[in-house]
């Protein structure tokens, strides 16, 4: 009798877990700020344009969480299987979306970085 209950309990657990997962959940991609000129910082912008409002700035070596969405329809998931040098070539002149905490106060938001200054981590 107990053995018959295990599949039912397992099915109920899977259903409950799936129901609580966030809709549109995504995997973040870790990329590192690199090749920014000495004494300079990489700006995170509100929109994907150099004239857009600056949200924050990060020095070389900072690892940022990218959402995977880039301008031009490129998704980082689509290039995840490539070697790092090919990933960098694919995004070199694109803006990609980041998830960051610009004020270090727990209020996370999205912003955009120019990928010329980023490398896979």
Residue ranges and their predicted role:
Residues 30-37, 65-69, 76, 83-84:
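A structural signal for short, hydrophobic beta-strand segments that form beta-sheets
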Residues 1-9:
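Bacterial N-terminal signal peptides that target proteins for export
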Residues 47-69, 74-75:
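SH3/SH3-like (including bacterial SH3b) beta-barrel domains
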Residues 9-17:
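Bacterial N-terminal signal peptides
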Residues 26-31, 47, 53, 82-121:
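Boundary regions of SH3-family modules and the immediately adjacent low-complexity/disordered segments
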Residues 19-26:
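Sec/Tat signal peptide C-region and signal peptidase I cleavage site
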């Amino acid at each position: 009798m107990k053995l018959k209950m295990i599949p039912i309990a397992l099915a109920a657990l899977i259903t409950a877990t799936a129901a609580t997962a966030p809709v549109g959940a995504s995997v973040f991609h870790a990329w590192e700020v690199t090749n920014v000129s000495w004494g300079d910082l990489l700006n995170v912008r509100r929109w994907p344009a150099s004239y857009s409002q600056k949200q924050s700035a990060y020095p070389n070596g900072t690892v940022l969480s990218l959402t995977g969405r880039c301008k031009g329809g490129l998704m980082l998931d689509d290039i995840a299987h490539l070697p790092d040098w090919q990933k960098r070539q694919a995004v070199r002149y694109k803006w990609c979306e980041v998830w960051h905490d610009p004020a270090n106060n727990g209020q996370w938001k999205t912003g955009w970085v120019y990928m010329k200054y980023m490398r896979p981590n």
